[in-house]
Amino acid sequence: VQIKAVSPANASNSGTATVTLHVPNQQTENSPVELGTSGSNAKDTITSGGKTTCCGGTLGALVTRGGTQYILSADHVLARSGAGTAGDPIVQPGLIETNCSPSGTSTVANLTQGSFNLQNPSSATVDAAIAQVVSGAVDTSGNILLLGSSTDASGVPAAGAPNGGKGQAASVNLSVAKSGRTTGLTCSAVGATNVNVSVAYSTNCDGSGTKFTVIYTNQISILGGDFSGGGDSGSLIVTQSNATPVALLYAGSNTDTVGNPVSDVLNFFASGGNTVSFVGAARTGSVIGCSLPGPQAAMAARLAAQKVTPSHDALVQATAVRDAHSGELMGHPEVQAVGVGASYDHPGEPAILLFVTKGQPRTNLPALVDGIRTRIVEGESFLQRGLLSSEESTALEQSAAPPQLVYSIPETEVARAKVVHAAHVDELMKMNGVQGVAITSSVDSPGQAALMIFLIDDVAHPAIPQEIDGVRTRIRASSRFHAGFEGKGSQRACPVPRPKRKPANAVPDSKPKSKP
């Protein structure tokens, strides 16, 4: 990139320089390697027409089973979507960093087990694989790049191990982080839980070969198209508060990332009475990188809701409905004013805006009025009261806190949404253009649950109901969910640089570095 510096004393004095940005997670690591780094199956190459293509992902975390340590990552990273063989070398960095040459890589583990059956890949319940570490090749503490709770003298986040053990379940609006091969350290929040999602795969890492789809249940989605990128598959998603594992990253779209719940991943690899746990220590410190200005600003951008203004005719219709029901709406004691604007749950559709006193109990405010959605705007005290003109409504809305893409919701709301989700998820997933159904929070009614309907951009779909069995619905349109994020646009995340580590002393019983 080009950087220009201008003198504050004399604007005519300036200079430019070209700077090459190196993503720290893509570098060759000194042994023993820390995780969150680039890696791949040494056999993950495709040669066609004299051209060789190779792929790479993220060596996500360290787990233990029966006293043996394994690297945990996505199946399509370590086990080639079921095409891998037990014993395959797992190398660091991934072949994608070395122009597909084994030169410059080191074998850090050997493939042990994957989750895909090559004869029936669509039956997979998780996208995960484990590889037994080569003695001395991997940091035994489970450190992950940039996930530490402290910084070095330059202000760069140190590596840090996650909370050891079994991890925790995700909840809507839980603050999370990950450190991956492509986008480094990124921070965001859980957008939805209980996600049923259709994910596209191909048998070859370059997108060629047999195409197939896996429909997963009980998944977790993370907000932000730039929370991850191609090559971040296999990253461990952890809580920002103390790096407790939450999910294993494996796919995404241009708006969201999806991961397997860590409980499902660990249970899959339990064997012979031996359970699987994350290697780490009891940790109280936060992922300090998420409090730095760059990652913090990027997270705020990911969580900001974007308004899509309805058509003039739609707003006119909503105003007529509002006026016809003004007495009923103003009869609720918490409602200070009623206006008209945009829905955030159904972008591009109008909404009747109910300006309510923040913290005051709600008296069964309607979600729909004659087919028009309502949107609740909370504030301490609004300047205007009663029915608002278009200009007054816009001004009053701008005086309130801007809406966020996700809010925390109480367990009672989650339980209510789970009942509706279970009753209707199958029929919704069969609709043309629908690629996912989940439980999230309503943006139009903060504090209430909603069913998230993930749609595929530019694919026709039936009308989505405004609410189902009393639960509001939300629409989120995006590119196709795809493992490896093929075709995803350029990333906007700015990875935090990391200082080079000094070479560690040789481990006496370590195996020599091998070349695949």
Predicted segments with their positions:
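Extracellular/luminal low-complexity segments enriched in Ser/Thr/Pro
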Residues: 1-2
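Short beta-strand edge segments in extracellular beta-sheet folds
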Residues: 18-24
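Protease-domain processing segments flanking chymotrypsin-fold serine proteases, especially trypsin-like
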Residues: 24-70, 82-120, 134, 287, ...
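C-terminal subregion of chymotrypsin/trypsin-like serine protease catalytic domains
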Residues: 226-228, 238-301
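Helix N-cap motif at beta-to-alpha junctions
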Residues: 356-362, 455-460
